[in-house]
Amino acid sequence: MKLEESLKKCPVIKRGEYNYFVHPITDGIPLVEPSLLREVACRILKIVDFSEVDKIVTAEAMGIHLATTLSLYTDIPFVIIRKRSYGLEGEIPVFQKTGYSKGQLYVNGIKEGDKVVIVDDVISTGGTMIAIIEALKRAGAEIKDIVCVIERGKGREIVEKKTGYKIKTLVKIDVVDGKVVIK
């Protein structure tokens, strides 16, 4: 499959002590091939039931292309959780901490009773996903499903234990000796 093959070839860089893999789905570089994006979207469509979903939710920035593609396939609108405040009525700020950064995220466009699917590019430490889940619960949304394209580390387990929500992923990886390894 294109996703797994492309992951095996992607470069790994250091961000402090964190080994960061650079991939089109997670970083938008070097080039996002339509065939790769299509494969990822079709694989998500096979494992997530969108039939009772009002909104697709993703975090800025690298979930945007995934949410856009899924929105086009399903005709379901999507909401982007942003890294800056717009000060709109009902905006929900939430603190996010990842393996290499921390800061505020801002949720707009979600109202009580919305049925949502969360889509993201990668789950690694679980920090972003926990923040998103907590914000959506505060907004009164019903989380129908959660899917991340790439699973790395213990983030999925941490999120599931802390929130009770199951996380679906397409591929599990690790970084060993400066290379991505499919598990």
From Swiss-Prot:
Keyword Cytoplasm annotated: yes
Keyword annotations of the record: Cytoplasm, Glycosyltransferase, Purine salvage, Transferase
Species: Methanocaldococcus infernus (strain DSM 11812 / JCM 15783 / ME)
Assembly behavior: Homodimer.
Record pathway: Purine metabolism; IMP biosynthesis via salvage pathway; IMP from hypoxanthine: step 1/1
Catalytic activity line of the entry: IMP + diphosphate = hypoxanthine + 5-phospho-alpha-D-ribose 1-diphosphate; GMP + diphosphate = guanine + 5-phospho-alpha-D-ribose 1-diphosphate
A GO molecular-function annotation: guanine phosphoribosyltransferase activity
Function text: Catalyzes a salvage reaction resulting in the formation of IMP that is energically less costly than de novo synthesis.
GO BP term, example: purine ribonucleoside salvage
Compartment list: Cytoplasm
Protein name: Hypoxanthine/guanine phosphoribosyltransferase
Annotated GO CC locations: cytoplasm
Superkingdom, natural source: Archaea
Primary localization class, coarse: cytoplasm
EC number: 2.4.2.8
Gene encoding the protein: hpt
Family matches, as Gene3D superfamilies: 3.40.50.2020
CDD domains: PRTases_typeI
Database matches in SUPFAM superfamilies: PRTase-like
Pfam families: Pribosyltran
Family named by the database record: Belongs to the purine/pyrimidine phosphoribosyltransferase family. Archaeal HPRT subfamily.
Enzyme class name: transferase
Transmembrane segments: none
